Regions:
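Short, solvent-exposed mixed-charge patches
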Residues: 136-138
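Amphipathic regulatory helices of Ca2+-sensor modules
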Residues: 51-58, 73-83, 99-107, 122-132
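Short, exposed beta-strand-loop hairpins at the edges of beta-sheets
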Residues: 112, 117, 121-126
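Glycine-aliphatic tripeptides that mark coil-to-beta-strand junctions in extracellular
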Residues: 45-49, 69-73, 94-98, 118-122
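C-terminal segment of classical bacterial N-terminal signal peptides
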Residues: 17-29
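Acidic carboxylate motifs that coordinate Ca2+ or other divalent cations, activating on Asp/Glu
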Residues: 40-44, 64-68, 89-93, 113-117
Length: 138
């Protein structure tokens, strides 16, 4: 019984330490740089709105399994938070059309581009806004 308790406590301790580290890793500059490489077809080291929308459109098509032209919460797999759902779904029909999805990508692109140069680099992708954008692109 003591061994089982010790194993449980050890596992809980490992999870307590590793889960926050994993969330930091996903937003780290190296993760963002890796993601950027797959989203940057012209290899200029940045993602512009056209590239972001192309990636988002491809992901939308991949996620849209029931062919009704929209994504619901289930199909989005948590890519849009409950807090942000109203922004992504302005007609409040509980689904996001491709046009709404791409409009939301544009909103997040602007948030992820604090210097307003029209492009998003790896550092900007590693920000919270950049991370939210990545969830809609990959």
């Amino acid at each position: 019984m003591k061994l089982k308790t010790l194993k449980t406590l050890t596992l809980a301790s490992l999870l307590a330490v590793s889960l926050p580290a994993m969330s930091l890793m996903s937003a780290s500059p190296s993760f963002a740089a890796s993601a950027l490489a797959s989203l940057d077809p012209d290899h200029d080291g940045t993602v512009d709105l056209t590239e972001a929308k192309a990636a988002a459109s491809a992901l939308f098509d991949k996620l849209e399994k029931d062919h009704d032209g929209t994504l619901d919460h289930k199909e989005l797999h948590g890519r849009i938070s409950d807090k942000d759902w109203a922004v992504a779904d302005p007609d409040n029909d509980k689904t996001v059309s491709k046009d709404e999805y791409l409009a939301y990508v544009e909103v997040l692109s602007k948030k992820a581009d604090p210097d307003n140069d029209g492009t998003i680099d790896a550092k900007e992708l590693s920000s919270p806004a950049g991370h939210a954008l990545l969830r809609l692109l990959k």
